[in-house]
Amino acid sequence: MNARIESLPRAQYLADTHEVSNLSSELCDYNMFTGDAALCEAVRREGGQWAEGELSEFGKLTGSADYLELGTLANKFLPEFDTHDRFGNRIDLVKFHPAYHQLMKTSIEHGLHASPWTTPGPGAHVARAARTYLHTQVEAGHGCPITMTFAALPSLRLQP
């Protein structure tokens, strides 16, 4: 069993009826990058080997139990749309769970929204694609606004 789950006292659960033996343990606290041989090979083959250290650190983050929990929370607590405030004023506000905001913040901090444009070079798109692949395994929904931001720059550059 997973050490994180085993550390919880069994008496905490009043319905201690049986031991679950037909399910695998939780996949967490591992390095998503170094644990993915195909991804590591693709990054090397396509010119992103310079980013392997950074990708390994990012893989530790995305594979951690606490970070995976953010993805669970972002999906469990769906966005809420408020049309009016408590005084009846129209606000049209979408409220997201704080976990969603943390996922967005991390995406931006790690350049998923723009890194090949802000730091161009050989393998820049490969490194960004690998980070995006790792991060969307945690939670994919936040990838839409991140990808739209990333995709907007080439279009904007075509404008006179």
Residue ranges and their predicted role:
Residues 96-160:
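Glycine-rich flavin
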